[in-house]
Curated annotation (Swiss-Prot):
It comes from Aspergillus fumigatus (strain CBS 144.89 / FGSC A1163 / CEA10). The chain crosses the membrane at residues 55-75, 138-158, 321-341, 398-418, 604-624. This is Plasma membrane fusion protein prm1. The keyword Transmembrane applies. It is found in: Cell membrane. Glycans are attached at residues 177, 222, 245, 256, 274, 454, 483, 490, 505, 552, 566. Keywords: Cell membrane, Conjugation, Glycoprotein, Membrane, Transmembrane, Transmembrane helix. The keyword Magnesium does not apply. GO terms for biological process: plasma membrane fusion involved in cytogamy.
């Protein structure tokens, strides 16, 4: 194709299309033959570049970023593996130290246990001595109170009765003795008088009788009277009562006997307690000392290696999946893009006819042809409005937000978010494997705790055996005598009751006082003695000692509690350092890598979001600009508005020819091609269809039309269809779009 110098000098951006016209003066564009050369790309040429469409390139960039992230994650995991193995070695050393801790702690615990036992035995000795002494004096006091009370009552009853009886007998005897003597004296006097008179009478009788040779005896009653005068009660009448009064028991013998009998077992028990617990020393050599432990769970353990190998396999698998998916997606993106190019090519060919038709706004035509999809989107959105001004503003806002630069920013942000999504999916897959490592580390901790529990249980069993043997020895050697003493005390009380009963039986047996005295004895003493015997029986049944035994988890309870699920603070684990957020140093390494990758993804997401916000800001600029002019009414010519361009009649095809004025071309080729027409220039068509002549266009009007800013061009100069009247007051062309 030949380009004239004059054509380029007059309108250098357009080639001399009229050079191919059979009649250069006609001014119509003649299509080139299908197999001819064209300065623009044809369909095949366009399809040859489908593989470098923006979506394929963006997907490939996403793939590259994901591959870089996977490589970085793999490198970080390699570093984490080394750190984890190092941490495992540290944990192994710490676990060995903890497992050996019973060896070191047992010595102090054994000393503490032995000292506690010695202090307990010393306190037991003091308590026993005080208790035995207190019980001894208490028993003696109670018995003394009992028999002295009984003695007082007995003395009051018996001695009082005897004293009364003896007094009565003495007074009766004295009264009888004095009365009998007086009666004898009186009788003696009377008898003496009678005897004197009678003897005188007998003397007379004897005088008479002597005459007859006989005599009468005299009366002599003096001896009988003397006997009556000397009559008195025998002194032995109250000797029995005096003997009974003097023979009342004072229970001194019972008191001495009882105290001797009661104190004997108590003193024996005190002696035995002093001999058994005089200076008690616990044999510390009997308590065991566990041996040291050496734990090995890093060497020959596939826990950490298998975890990181699985993570590496996961990353490699994810890399392959992303490569396959993104490459397939990038390849498949070529199919719709090829179809889009075909449709774009067809649309360009169809819309290129607008150049030959009545085109009042050539820049709009060029925009529609060059940006078919964004222009179609704008036309679709504008079809919702009936006002041509608002239609243009809507199209302008969409065109402003869909410029190549704006779409590049949007695609870049979307690609960044897609890359972050792929990295996030990869990170989530890695995070799901962290519990597996925690399980492996938990197995390490369980090994340490199991070793501690075994050592603690073995030590506790041996120590408890020693403590149990000591408790048995104390029960036999100390509390055995307590049992013996309670039995002896019960026997002593029985002896006391029997002895007292024997004394009462010997004293009052067969008398009227025996039964009442025995009832009083049973009420005052017998019931109390029975209560004491019950208490002694209870002491006999419960007199034993049981020292508390050591629990089996003495050395392992704290370690087991630190790794249990009930622990609220993960840093309490013995595998973690102070301030660690995870339960152990091994998983801390992996968590640190995951947090690092997560921070990187978060940063990239923020950057991608900011890029998308930049596009949103650009779109908002266009929307705000359109809204600013949306409600502004059209300016009339008198208010500074432009003049209305007259519309001309169309031809039978419905379009007005736009003549392309050509300039002469001095260059000819070997085929003697006709001189090309000058560069095309848009002109307003006349009312006739055939004639086409050049109509000068104002430079100011040309500049207004070329700017393309909303509100800066003549809205009435838009494309018009069929030359019909604008029923809606708009000269905006309808591109086969139904307005609603």
């Amino acid at each position: 194709m030949l380009f004239s110098r004059s054509g380029r000098s007059i309108f250098p951006l357009l080639p001399p299309y009229a050079a191919h016209a059979p009649n250069p003066n006609q001014g119509h564009i003649i299509a080139l033959p299908p197999d001819g050369l064209t300065p623009y790309l044809g369909l095949r040429a366009r399809l040859s570049q489908v593989w470098i469409n923006r979506w394929t390139i963006l997907l490939l960039l996403v793939l590259v970023r994901v591959l870089l992230a996977a490589s970085g994650l793999q490198a970080d995991m390699s570093t984490a593996k080394r750190e984890a193995l190092s941490a495992c070695t540290s944990v192994e050393s710490m676990g060995s130290s903890m497992a050996s801790m019973p060896h070191y702690l047992s010595q102090g615990v054994n000393e503490l246990t032995a000292t506690g036992v010695e202090k307990a035995v010393s306190g037991l000795k003091s308590m026993l001595m005080l208790t035995i002494t207190g019980v001894e004096e208490l028993v003696l006091f109670i018995i003394k109170v009992l028999y002295q009370t009984y003695l007082c009552l007995f003395t009051l009853a018996v001695r009082g009765s005897v004293h009364v009886a003896v007094g009565v007998i003495k007074e009766a005897a004295d009264f009888l003795n004095s009365t009998v003597k007086e009666v004898g004296d009186d009788i003696g006097k009377a008898v003496s008088t009678f005897e004197s008179a009678f003897n005188k009478f007998l003397d007379g009788v004897n005088t008479v009788a002597s005459a007859f040779g006989a005599s009468v005896p005299t009366l002599d009653l003096n001896s009988s009277i003397s006997t009556l005068e000397n009559l008195q009660l025998p002194s032995s009448i109250d000797q029995g009562l005096d003997k009974l009064n003097s023979s009342l028991p004072t229970f001194d013998e019972v008191n001495n006997f009882t105290q001797t009998v009661l104190r004997t077992p108590f003193e024996e028990v005190k002696k035995l307690v002093n001999e058994s617990l005089g200076t008690y020393t616990f044999d510390r050599s009997l308590l065991p000392v566990p041996a040291k432990e050496q734990l090995t769970f890093c060497e020959g353990s596939n826990g950490i290696d298998s975890f990181f190998d699985s993570v590496t396999d996961l990353v490699m698998k994810a890399r392959k999946i992303f490569i396959a998916i993104l490459i397939v997606a990038a390849t498949l993106a070529c199919v719709p893009m090829a179809w889009q190019e075909i449709r774009r090519w067809r649309s360009m060919k169809e819309r290129s006819q607008l150049v030959r038709k009545e085109a009042h706004d050539p820049m709009d035509v060029v925009y529609i042809v060059s940006r078919p999809y964004t222009a179609a989107a704008g036309i679709k959105a504008a079809s919702r409005f009936s006002n041509s001004r608002r239609q243009i503003l809507v199209r302008w806002a969409i065109a402003y937000a869909t410029t190549p630069a704006a779409l590049f920013v949007l695609c870049l942000g979307v690609a960044g978010l897609l890359s972050c999504l792929c990295q996030y999916l990869l990170l989530q897959a890695v995070e799901k494997t962290v519990p597996e490592l925690s399980t492996q580390v938990g197995a390490f901790a369980d090994k340490v705790v199991d070793s501690l529990q075994n050592a603690s249980a073995e030590w506790a069993n041996d120590a408890n055996g020693v403590i149990g043997h000591m408790s048995q020895d104390l029960n036999e050697n100390v509390f055995g005598w307590v049992n013996t003493s309670t039995t002896a005390l019960n026997d002593t009380l029985n002896t006391f009751v029997d002895k007292t009963t024997g004394v009462l039986n010997d004293t009052f047996g067969g008398t009227l006082l025996y039964e009442p005295l025995m009832d009083v004895f049973g009420c005052l003493i017998g019931l109390k003695v029975q209560g004491i015997q019950k208490g002694l029986t209870w002491v006999h049944d419960h007199a034993h000692i049981d020292f508390p035994l050591l629990p089996n988890d003495t050395f392992s309870r704290g370690a087991a509690a630190s790794i249990s699920s009930n622990s609220s603070n993960p840093s309490d684990s013995f595998l973690a350092d102070a301030g660690d957020q995870t339960s152990n140093k091994i998983t801390e390494v992996v968590i640190r890598v995951v947090n690092k990758v997560e921070d990187g993804i978060r940063t990239e997401t923020i950057i991608s979001g900011v890029i998308i916000l930049i596009w949103v800001f650009i779109a908002l600029i266009g929307i705000v600009r359109a809204l600013t002019l949306f409600w502004v009414r059209d300016r009339n010519r008198g208010e500074g508005g432009g003049a209305r361009v007259n519309h001309h009649l169309s031809d039978a095809g419905g379009f007005i020819d736009v003549p392309l004025m050509a300039v002469s071309n001095t260059n000819t080729d070997a085929r003697s091609m006709p001189p090309p027409a000058p560069a095309p220039r848009y002109e307003a068509s006349t009312s006739t269809v055939v004639a086409s002549r050049a109509v000068p266009v104002s430079s100011t009007h040309h500049e207004d039309e070329k700017l393309g800013f909303a509100g800066e061009r003549q809205y009435g100069s838009a494309l018009k269809v069929d030359g019909a009247a604008d029923l809606r007051g708009s000269s905006y062309v309808e591109y086969d779009m139904e307005k609603r």
